Amino acid sequence: MSEINFDAMTSREMLNYLVAKNMEDARQAKARGDLVCWASSIAPCEFCEAMGIYTVYPENHVVGIAARKGAPELLAYAEQKGYSNDICGYARANLAYMDVQKCVSEEMPLPDVVLLCNNICDTLYKWYENIAYTLHIPCMVVDVPFNHDSVVTEENVNYVAEQFKEIIRQLETLTGKKFDYDKFEEVMKVAAQNAADWYEATSLCSAVPSPLSGFDMFNYMALIVCMRGKPECGQTFRKLNAELKQMIAEGRCGMKGVEEKHRIMWDGIACWPYLSHTYKVLKNYGINMVGSTYPSAWALRYTPGDLKSLARAYTSMGNNLGMQGQYDLRKNIIQDTKCDGVIMHMNRSCKMCDFMQYEIGQKLQEELHVPITTFDGDQADPRNYSPAQYETCLLYTSPSPRD
């Protein structure tokens, strides 16, 4: 990537270039006979990165497919194979792609190994087991206990840290090489700094008006998911943060051509097949999405070189917390980003996100006195979203749209 002059590029240009280049690098690695890993979105990438294994992310790949309206064909294929439409849309589309290996987005090379961490959901177990079984490849698992009391216990940290040692052993067997602990610590330093830079970007949304729309945040999120162990990821976020600070100094809003009248938190994953529609309807009302439970999940904090610190970070995901922890996370986002209300995406694909929303929403209304509206949708399956319902939900909780 050294041939590219990043200094002459905007952060958006860097984002687009790096996302495409990262997948191309994985395809070239596969063609050379190098190892490729499919990993869940918040699995500990640091281990594969340290061993020179190219890592790509099925969830992010399906995001690109869904946003380009290419998911229905894959979903239909999966359902014809016997996968119920109650299963996560990411899983169905990815399992179909594994068979057909064609899509409207970037083609993703098949894996030589899969790595999952159930700190976001348990659907991953059977999803990744099916991949490993079908392709006859190893499946590496990091099992993270659920923090029912929203407190990460020392026992849980030790349990996960011991599994990290097993991941190291498996990687040594797979690659035929000794694990490079010096490289591992260096990767951890890079990833921790990238996470800090990403956290700063999400925090800058607290400015009024916000220099960044949350929908732009969803796009930039691709880097922290796919490249958080690579230096170019941090370069992009530092460029982004400089741009955002300049916009704040100039009092400019991230929604071009529209005054920021209201600020909301988006609860849940984006509705990728209708990302443009969900954004434009909000913009029509002068509503800027400035906070979200989704992008900040990748702002991992740990001490480089410390396995227990790494284990604690990967065990502390928002989805892995009990009801009080989930509530506190949302309360802090609403207060920190000065939100006037909340939109909750009742995402058919993500039961982990949805099942707590009703009670959390009630509690937020009672204690913070913020209006909350919900809409039905899906992160990948367009059949579960109604544009009219979304518009109606906003109509009865928002001022009149701009002329």
Regions found by a protein language model. Give the residues of each.
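Redox- and metal-dependent alpha/beta enzyme cores, enriched for Fe-S-associated oxidoreductases
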Residues: 51-76, 269-329
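Acidic/glycine-enriched edge-of-secondary-structure segments
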Residues: 2-7, 73-96, 226-234, 298-325
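A short, acidic, amphipathic alpha-helical segment used as a generic capping/interface helix at domain edges
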Residues: 101-103, 321-338, 355-359
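Internal, well-ordered alpha/beta segment that forms a basic, Gly-enriched binding/recognition surface
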Residues: 108-173, 179-181, 186, 193, ...
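An N-terminal, globular interaction/scaffold subdomain
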Residues: 42-87, 92-95, 99-103, 127-128
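Conserved small/polar residues in nucleotide/adenosyl-binding loops
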Residues: 396-403
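Short, flexible loop segments at boundaries between secondary-structure elements
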Residues: 369-385
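A charged, amphipathic alpha-helical module
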Residues: 2-35, 161, 165-294, 300, ...
